[in-house]
Every structure is written in C-alpha cells, then in structure tokens.
C-alpha cells in the first residue's frame, strides 16, 4: 500500500533517537532565543551601525532553528509534505547563510577597526587621566603657593616672613628640616640664620665659594644636593638613610635708593640659600610639582623681603626724619625766639637811643644858630656830624636786621627817576667838594623819566655806593652813569645764576659809579659786601671801613631782583661799582595818576612861625624840653603835656599842630588821635596831628595813617628838619615824606 512515506535508511535505535530528538529541541530553542536577544539589545542601542547584518544573521539563526525543529518529525517515518517543508527550510537556510557569509566579508574589517578604535580610546583615556592628574597637581600646587604667599605677605617684618616661610613649607611638604642661610654683610660667608626644628645653633657659617653653593646660585631652579654637603648637615646625630635634600637660591633684590642694615654689599652675590630636607628613613622622593612649589615660594620670599626691607628702611628714615624735624622745630623756635629777642632789643634800643640822640642833635643845631667862636662852631659841627652819623648807623642796623629776618618789604610806587638822581648828586656834591673830588652824572637822558619801584631804597643804595666812592677818593673824580640796560650788558660772568629776562612791563636800570680813589685788592672785593668790611690795605687810614652800607645795599638790590658787584684793577687804580635793579614801567593809563611832588618855596628857610600855637605830648620830660626848645626857637607858642587825658583837656581850636610821641607806656596814643578827630569834627577845624617817634617800623607808620594822623617824623630832629616839617604842614596840610 502506497502511503507516500520514506522508509528509514538504518534501523532505529530508540536511545539514539531519543537523544537526537532532545538535542534538536534544545538547539531549536537556542536558535529561536538568540534572535530575540539580538532584537532586544538592538532596540536598546540607538547608535548600532549594522542593523541589516543583524536582520540577516537573525534570519539565518531562525532558519537553522527551524530545520532542527523540523528534524524532530523527520527522525521517524514522515510524510512527503514534511519532507518538502524540510527541504524548503534547508534551501532558505543555505541562501541566508551564504548571504550572511558574504556580508561578513565586509563587516569583519569594520569590527576589527572598532577594536582598534577601542584600544586608541583606552590609550586616550589613560592619557587624559594623566593630564587630569597633572592639572590636579598644578591646582594643588597653586593652592599651596597662594596659601604660602598669603602667609608670607601677611606681614612686612623680615624675621616673621622668614620664620613663616620655613614653618609653612615644612607643614605643606612634610619636611624634616628647612633652613635659611643668609649672606653676611661683607658677602664672604653664608650664616645659618633660621631653622625649622631649631636643632642647630644659629650663627654657624660656611664659605660662600663652596662648589655646592656656586651650583645653586648659578640657576634659578631648585637643585638636589648631597645630604652630606656642609649646608645640609642639619640632622641630629644617629640618623641614617637620609632623605633627599634640595636647595634653592633666594634673590635679595637690589635696592639702589636705600641703605638697609644687614643687607649685602652691591659687589657681592645678593642671594640667600634655602635648604629643604625630606624625612630620613623614607623612600619618598622629590616630585616635579614640589620642586616648582619651592621655586615659586623662593621668588615670593624674595619679593616679600624686598618690600619688608624697604618698609623697614622707610620707617627708620621716618623716625630719623621725625627726630630731625623735632630738632629743626626746636632750633626754629629757638631761632624765632632769638630773632624776637633781637628785634625787641633793637626796637627798645632804637627808641631809647633816638631819645638822647634827639636831644643831642636838636641842641647842637640850636647852638649852631647862636653866636659862637670859630673853635666853638667847629666843636658843635663835629658833635652834630657825629650825631647824624650815629643816627644813620642806627637806621642801617635796623634795616639790616629787618632784611635778615625777611620782615622788610619794598614800598613800591611811581616816582621820577631823573629827579632822584639829581637829589643824590646834590647831596653828594658838598661832601665831594670838601675832598676836592669832582662828581658828575651822565647818560641819564636815555632812561625813562618815571619808573615804578621803591624810591626810598633806591636812593639809599645810590647814597651808599656813591658815598663809599667819595669816601675813598681824596681827590680826582666820581662819575655816575645810569642807563636802561640792554640784554648784553646785564650779565656778570662771576654770577651765572643772575639771568634777567626782559619784558614790556619792566626794564633793568644799570648804574655805574666809577672813582679814581684808592682802589681795592682783587682778593678783598668779595669781603666788601660783608658787615663792617674794611679794605685791609687802607684799614689804618682815616677812611675806615664800608660799615653796613654795602651789605645793606646788596640786600636791597636782591629784593629788587638785581645784582651788584665791584671791579678794581688794584690799589691806587680806582674802582667801579655796578648794580642792576628791576623797575616797572608805568602804563599810559597810570601816567595822569602820578603823585604830585610839590616844591617847597625857595624862601622856606627864612619862614617864621611867630605865634604858631603848638602842643607837644611826650611822657619824657627831657624830650619835651628839647622839642619845645626847637619850636620856641622857631617862634612857636608851645604847650607841653605828658598824657592823653591832659592832651584832650588842654587842646583847643587855637592849636594848629599837635606833636605826640606814640610810644608812651600805658597810653594808647592812636586812640587819643581818634578822640581828637571826634572832638573837632571836620578836618579844617582840628589841629594837624604829627607823630614824633623813635619807632622806625612799618607798623607804626601804618597805624598812624590808619587813625588819620597827618604825618610821621622820626627822632632825632634838628632845627632845619623841624623848620621843613612845619613849612610843609602849613602849606600842604600833610607831611609828604617822613
């Protein structure tokens, strides 16, 4: 009977068949589970690049599993249909297997390259790990550096900086010992100055020329040195297997503007030596980042030491400066006290000396106008001349005193320059004629007629210079030339610091006084401007010295921004005095405002003041008597009082002039003047008020003008001066020049 079945090709063995059946079943289960796992993990992976390969591989496995599953039914008698299914499954499996095999030819190289990339990435990851380790090490080193720098910079004391450095380095690097060797001031040795553990005596020295020291000083890097080197023998006895030792130089920065104690000389090596030791008996070694840390700290210590040294020297200089300031302040106060004492003394002496001088000159001038024998007249004239000379000397002493302490100032105003020179010439001519000396004035026409300056002081300079020329000339001539100097004639090779600058607002007056007198030794010329200087060659002769005249003149010339000098070719060859002063040029708008200089009538010497009622207020009875004698001699009706109250009580409208001493102790004479104004009201109803005083200071004059006085005259006063004062008062109602 045909059942469309295949007979088995060998006898069935039940046991073998049973094993094949079980094996095919598990193979089929395994083949079916593998694609499921592949599908699961492929879905979980979003970046897998071989999805089609997995599909083919999965189909191959599924078909292989299907063939094994079908074999479960083909191991026994089976139908033709099952055989066709089995054949179809194997054919498909063969096709898919070949396709998968062909695909693997292209895939396997990629899979191998993936492995290569994996190894590359692993190497890269390891390299990154090393770099990250270096970065972490650098960050840690930087943190240590910042920490150490902060600790080092937290103070500006050198000793604290160095101790802090050793302590912080020892703590950060776990050192057994850390030491600092400082150069001695001569720079020939290194001295152990600081240690961390204090196990060695401070002050131990080693020569600076040791090879190991030269090796360290020759580089700015930390250098490993032998533990047995002289600078590294800092461990306690009994230690063996010493740890590694490094040394680094610490620059001691050059401080050119400071002289600092304990700092090496500039000619020596300006380094300190820092030695660092790892613990003994350990296998620890110095790492690169630790050496870098040591190098950075050494540089920071160098900067901190320089700052501390500068601060230390600045504080020392400040203390020294404070001491000097205290000493200078004390000296200044003492000098001010001395100046005040001198000024007070001069003021008192001035007032006290002028009072008797007033009596001498006044009485001598009165005697001069009486009938005298020639011998008596000669004696009176000698007394009067000597008294006038003494009064001039008193004025010079006061002027010099005020010039030296800076209290004297120029009284600047507009004046007639030509008139000033003619006045000087008129004053000098009588003296020159007595000595058979011809005096003349030249070149004045090329000077401006009016100028701005201190007329009184310029006249004083001229009188001093011309007076000296006449004084030292027995006969011959004295010539005075004055010009508005040009730039080329202003310089003096002996005074290069004098460098005048021309402008439109001022000019420089150049005055030259040339005489044919005794001349001067060239070596004596610089001494002439000293106080009471004498020409040594002429010191025994009657001419004497220059007194204070030239010394005062030089200071006045300096106040006028000028220069003065003297030239002479030697003894017997005459001399030339030259001075230059700066004067202002009045503007056109100021010309109408030039002060009117009235001329006294030519016959004022013959004027009489018969019946003129005058009141004198002076506490000094002797001075009252002398002043009264002058006025009575001139014909005045004189009343004298000794106090302000008496003055106000006695004073009436009949009195035309009041002379009052403004230096009466216990009386405010300025207040008396104010009360006189109040008593008589309008100006034309009151008497003229004149201060008769021995005080020559500017304050006295300003106070007199402030309270409305009509003039100030200084003691001593002669008959001629009193006559001139009264004439000026009665004609103009004011004294134009004191």
From Swiss-Prot:
Binds 1 copper ion per dimer. Its cofactor is Cu cation. Keywords: ATP-binding, Copper, Disulfide bond, Endoplasmic reticulum, Ethylene signaling pathway, Kinase, Membrane, Metal-binding, Nucleotide-binding, Phosphoprotein, Receptor, Transferase, Transmembrane, Transmembrane helix, Two-component regulatory system. One of its GO terms (molecular function) is phosphorelay sensor kinase activity. Activation probably requires a transfer of a phosphate group between a His in the transmitter domain and an Asp of the receiver domain. GO terms for cellular component: endoplasmic reticulum; endoplasmic reticulum membrane. It is a multi-pass membrane protein. May act early in the ethylene signal transduction pathway, possibly as an ethylene receptor, or as a regulator of the pathway. Belongs to the ethylene receptor family. This is Ethylene receptor.
